[in-house]
C-alpha cells in the first residue's frame, strides 16, 4: 500500500544530503553509507522510527548502515529500480546522473548553513527535486551533512597553494575533481569505503569531507591534519 510521508528532515550544507523514497511496500529497505557515530546514521534510524509511528506500524523500515547494500551510485540506481526503498544520499555523486544536482553542488557556493537552507527551500531546491522526480526518485527532505573540508597526512592546508602536488580523494563528480586540479592537486574520485586504506597505503595524500565523516570512520588515524576550508 502506498503511504505518503511528510517532510520530516530539513536541508543540508555544502555537501547536500537528502532522504528519498520510491517504495510501495509495507516493509522497506533503506540505505546509508555511514556507520555508528555519524549524524546521518542517527537521522536514518529516527526516520525509520517516524515512518513506523506515522503509519501506525503499517510500514516498517530496516536501515542498512555502512554501505552494505552497495556504493552510493549503486544504491541510487537500486532506489530508481525499486530494489532499495529509501536512502540518504549526497548530491555530489548524483550530479553525473541528475545534472540539476550540480546547481547546488558547486564548491563553496553557500555562505552558511542558513544560506543553504534558504536556497534548498526555494526555487533552486524545487528544481533539483523536480529533476530527481523525473529520474524516478521522490525527495522528501534536505538536511545538513556538514561542510566539506580538506584533510591529509602531510601538513596543514592554509591556502589553495598548499594543495599543489597532492593526490586528493574526491567524490565521483567532475566539479570536485576540477576544484582540486585547479589548485594544482590531483583530484582522485574514489568510493568513501576505500579512503581509509588509501590514506594508510599512500594511494592518496588526503581527502575532502565533513568533520563527522572524518571522525566516525577513523580517518583521523591516518590523516593528522584537518583544515577547515
Where are these regions (language model features)?
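Sec/Tat signal peptide C-region and signal peptidase I cleavage site
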Residues: 19-25
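N-terminal secretory/targeting leader peptides
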Residues: 10-13, 26-115, 123-229
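Bacterial N-terminal signal peptides that target proteins for export
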Residues: 1-12
Amino acid at each position: 500500500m502506498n503511504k505518503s510521508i511528510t517532510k520530516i528532515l530539513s536541508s543540508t550544507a555544502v555537501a547536500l544530503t537528502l532522504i528519498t523514497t520510491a517504495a510501495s511496500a509495507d516493509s522497506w529497505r533503506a540505505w546509508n553509507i555511514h556507520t555508528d557515530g555519524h549524524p546521518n546514521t542517527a537521522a536514518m534510524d529516527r526516520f525509520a522510527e517516524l515512518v513506523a509511528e506515522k503509519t501506525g506500524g503499517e510500514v516498517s523500515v530496516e536501515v542498512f548502515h555502512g554501505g552494505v547494500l552497495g556504493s552510493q551510485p549503486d544504491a541510487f540506481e537500486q532506489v530508481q529500480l525499486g530494489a532499495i526503498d529509501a536512502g540518504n544520499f549526497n548530491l555530489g555523486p548524483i550530479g553525473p546522473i541528475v545534472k540539476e544536482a550540480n546547481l547546488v553542488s558547486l564548491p563553496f557556493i553557500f555562505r552558511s548553513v542558513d544560506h543553504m537552507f534558504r536556497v534548498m527551500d526555494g526555487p533552486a531546491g524545487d528544481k533539483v527535486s523536480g529533476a530527481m522526480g523525473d529520474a524516478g526518485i521522490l525527495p522528501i527532505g534536505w538536511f545538513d551533512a556538514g561542510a566539506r573540508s580538506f584533510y591529509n597526512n602531510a601538513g596543514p592546508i592554509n591556502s589553495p597553494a598548499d594543495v599543489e602536488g597532492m593526490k586528493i580523494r574526491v567524490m565521483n563528480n567532475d566539479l570536485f575533481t576540477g576544484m582540486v586540479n585547479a589548485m594544482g592537486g590531483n583530484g582522485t574520485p574514489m568510493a568513501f569505503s576505500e579512503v581509509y586504506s588509501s590514506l594508510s597505503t599512500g594511494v592518496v595524500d588526503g581527502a575532502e569531507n565533513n568533520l563527522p565523516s572524518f571522525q566516525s570512520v577513523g580517518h583521523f588515524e591516518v590523516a593528522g591534519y584537518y583544515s577547515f576550508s
